[in-house]
Amino acid sequence: MAFDFKKECKELYKPASKPSIVTVPPMSYVAVRGKGDPNTEGGEYQNALPLLYGIAYTVKMSKKGSRSIEGYFDFVVPPLEGFWWQESPSGDIDYVHKDNFNFISCIRLPDFVTRDDFDWAVAEAATKKKLDFSAVELLKVDEGLCVQCMHTGPYDNEPATVDAMHEYTTELGYVPDFSDTRLHHEIYLSDPRKCAPEKLKTVVRHPIKRAE
């Protein structure tokens, strides 16, 4: 049975529809950075997706090739994730002006993936997929203390969920803790190409700290 992060780490991938506080452990990702409206056909975001999945599936399918990865176990490729920000000191996201988005689009990798394994996967995927994988990176993220919530509905309706998260943490004595490395985080549990907008499920996560 392939290891499924969504099922084994439910506190990270299946939070309640009401806000909750969680301490997120360090993780590794295959990631691509970019800018612009994620809905733009042929834009940086759309072009990043085949690169991410190309690396993730190359690692997963290494069991059938010549590469022997130490500590390997079969796994279900985790859901697509994204870290988003705009040039705003507060860390607030303006969903109207999507052209101003900066993003790190990413997919979680198992902890057994080393730098050497990652570099091998990049070279292997580039050979097989005939794509330019120079934009991908092995990203280490340590989110730590966060508030999160399951958002159901269109992405543009996320501000209501974010407001509920902020109200919840304020009542408990926490404040937002955005920085260059602590960002608005989304985990996409639904495929927008196959799911009605009102049924989309997205984990929304924000960094927090104790109020001084």
Q: Can you say where each PLM-predicted feature lies in the sequence?
A:
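A solvent-exposed interaction/effector surface
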Residues: M1-E212
